[in-house]
């Protein structure tokens, strides 16, 4: 009798734990596995260089600025008549970012941009649309900067589940 009572209590406790655990949402971020990725060693080299040198500082600032301004999904520099000095600073930041990208090896442009976007994302609390804009900017920078051999970076832009 005691064994049956114990089994019933254990089964009820297990059901309660499973029900309670299913209430929570989890966002999981996957990193590419260097072992299964044929260009894994190159990616490791790019990542090490990015971490060692902290490359792409101007690009990180540009991504953050673009996200904060809340512009459309297109990457552009609109004429800001109210703040021409701000537009000039943004243009200088853009030129510095493009110069930083031109110094990268072509194979490392997209991986280092992805790392830079991730670093910007982790620097502060951003709304989902801001995070999307950070990655959108990073993805299209090679094209906008006219980087040889690179057009648009093939990495995915993070999506966030709807809670409504």
Curated annotation (Swiss-Prot):
It comes from the Eukaryota. Residues 1-21 form the signal peptide. Gene3D superfamilies: Plant lipid-transfer and hydrophobic proteins. InterPro entries: Bifun_inhib/LTP/seed_sf, Bifunc_inhib/LTP/seed_store, Napin/2SS/CON. Keywords: Disulfide bond, Seed storage protein, Signal, Storage protein. Pfam families: Tryp_alpha_amyl (PF00234). One of its GO terms (molecular function) is nutrient reservoir activity. Residues 22-37, 74-83, 163-164 form a propeptide. This is a 2S seed storage protein. The mature protein consists of a small and a large chain linked by disulfide bonds. Belongs to the 2S seed storage albumins family. This is the most abundant isoform of 2S albumin in Arabidopsis. This is 2S seed storage protein 1. It comes from Arabidopsis thaliana.
């Amino acid at each position: 009798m005691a064994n049956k009572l114990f089994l019933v209590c254990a089964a009820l406790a297990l059901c309660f734990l499973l029900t309670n655990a299913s209430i929570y949402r989890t966002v999981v971020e996957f990193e590419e596995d260097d072992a299964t990725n044929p260009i894994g060693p190159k990616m490791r080299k790019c990542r090490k260089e990015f971490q060692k040198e902290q490359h792409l500082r101007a690009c990180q600032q540009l991504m953050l600025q673009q996200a904060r301004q809340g512009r459309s999904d297109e990457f552009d520099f609109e004429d800001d008549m109210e703040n021409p000095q701000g537009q000039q600073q943004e243009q200088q930041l853009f030129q510095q970012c493009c110069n930083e990208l031109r110094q990268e090896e072509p194979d490392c442009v997209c991986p280092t941009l992805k790392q830079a976007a991730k670093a910007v994302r982790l620097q502060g609390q951003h709304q989902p649309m801001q995070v999307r804009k950070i990655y959108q900017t990073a993805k299209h920078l090679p094209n906008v900067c006219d980087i040889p051999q690179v057009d648009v970076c093939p990495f995915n832009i993070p999506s966030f589940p709807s809670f409504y």
